Amino acid sequence: MKRVYIALAASALLFNTAVFAQEALKSAEENYYDFLSLQGLVKRPALNYRTLSDSVWNVSPSTEHAWQLNNLGTTYTLLDTSDSMQNAFLDGSVNGIKARLYGPQWYNSYNTAAPYGMNDGALWQGKGYNTSLTAGARLEAYGLELTLKPQFVFSQNLDFEIMKSHSDSEYGYFWGYGTKNNGVDLPQRFGDEAFYYFDWGDTEVRYTWKNLTLGFGTQAIWLGPAQVNAILHSNNAPTYPKFDAGLRRTEIHIPWLNWYIGDIEARIWTGKLTESDYYDSDESNDNNMIHGLALAYAPSFVPGLTLFANRTCLVKWDWENLKYIIPVEANTHVGEQGAGEDQKMSFGADWIFAPVGLEIYGELGLDDFVPNSFPIGYIRYPLHTLVYTLGLKKAFTHSDEKKIYGEFTMEINSTEMSQDFQLQWPYNFGFHHQITQGYTNRGQYLANATGYGGNLQYISYSVFYPKGKTMLTVARWNPDNNYIYSVAINSVASDKENNIDLNKTHFMSWKANFILGPAVNYSRSDSVGQANKIL
């Protein structure tokens, strides 16, 4: 059945500046600071891996920019002991007690025909009215950080036509691998009633010494430079409990020679994923374990360039499977050892040309092992399971005097199956035959907001001015072309005798979505103060 959906969305955000600010993923504030980095006015705090705790922006008070006089948030100093307490363990840490309040941020949407939404955390935006409310606070003291920022969501979840389910639940996804309950936990609809949900959101406890950090909590992770469709991880799904450790963005100097060779960043984490209530009836497989590794390097000899590589591994929930967090050779065929496995990796580059306000980026993702192994298999067919996101951002100056600036963003994403699978079996980057819930948490994909198996073309233009931002978005995408390909794999293209014509029965039924979306953010400029206020 061919359907074209047009979605119009507008959101209003109350946000609070600061010269030194720590911002939530994809918030209005973080997007604005990222725009400043495109102009070379501020240095990005993270190269590849970022959460709310990592997104710490340090803007000089003397830097002139559109929102310079706005109140974007203030860090309060409750106790300052920097003069009385000095030791190696506090070097590089907050020497005293500081606090910050977040939000509240209230998001609302109304979908007239079918579910639509992306990169919205625990919120599943079904047909009808949807809303999300988040607020919180952060406390820092002597290297310790405590953040409480939960998310409360509601979906009216009105009825709409769905396809036949491939799982025990009648609301499950409409296709998968082979037998029932095999492929992905991605409900078409979360039951037949309106529902509320509480998520811990960006909540965590953390300890940081200089740039070494470790923490436990539920903060969402964003990997890579993508603005809409991150390949391996974003804030598209509900959060999950995890432990992480690593090195935040750090300058590297060769000892004695005092040569600066660039910045590095490294993070490793493990967490617990949960099945939705609308998949199978087997309670023994309700949880999976996720392991992740993220590495990045920004060479000093190529200004603005960042190279990165990421790896994730999903295994069955068993404490014994913690050993698979390290990607050594013995852990590359986990499924053969009874743990189940779904390993994926991505790598790419992000290059900012600050003098001209230009950024280009790309990320390639790989899944599964190529037939005939490495390197022969990739020499024979290098596109096996390959997915990608490519993007470009450009800053424009409309009026320096009135502080009006523009930002053009274009992103292209494709996660359709590589065509060698036409000779093998149906495939989807987000599905798996051992981790049968696929690459999901609580029924939503961990990344790639528009879904794996399709393609997206996205364009937006934002105008920043002293009172806020106005943005217009135009996009179109096919959410899951792999479903069509899966039907075609074991079929003939044309058979007049048996009345078979795949072009008429499947190609002409592809689902295409068109998005036209305005958005406005309004900023208050009352009582501008310093980033740090002493109480």
Annotated model-derived regions:
Residues 139-178, 301-305:
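Carboxylate/His-rich catalytic cores and anion/metal-binding grooves
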Residues 4, 106, 198, 298, ...:
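Exposed, low-structure sequence patches enriched in small/polar residues
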Residues 122-126, 136, 159-164, 181-193, ...:
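Extracellular/periplasm-exposed beta-strand and loop segments of Gram-negative cell-envelope proteins
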Residues 23-24, 95, 139-143, 208-211, ...:
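Short loop/turn motifs that connect adjacent beta-strands in outer-membrane beta-barrel proteins
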Residues 117-121, 155-157, 187-188, 212, ...:
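Sequence/structural signature of outer-membrane beta-barrel proteins
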Residues 1-25:
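Bacterial Sec-dependent N-terminal signal peptides
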Residues 170-191, 195-196, 219-298, 310-339, ...:
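Surface-exposed coil loops of outer-membrane beta-barrel proteins
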Residues 20-129, 135-142:
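N-terminal periplasmic/intermembrane-space "pro-region" immediately following the signal or transit peptide
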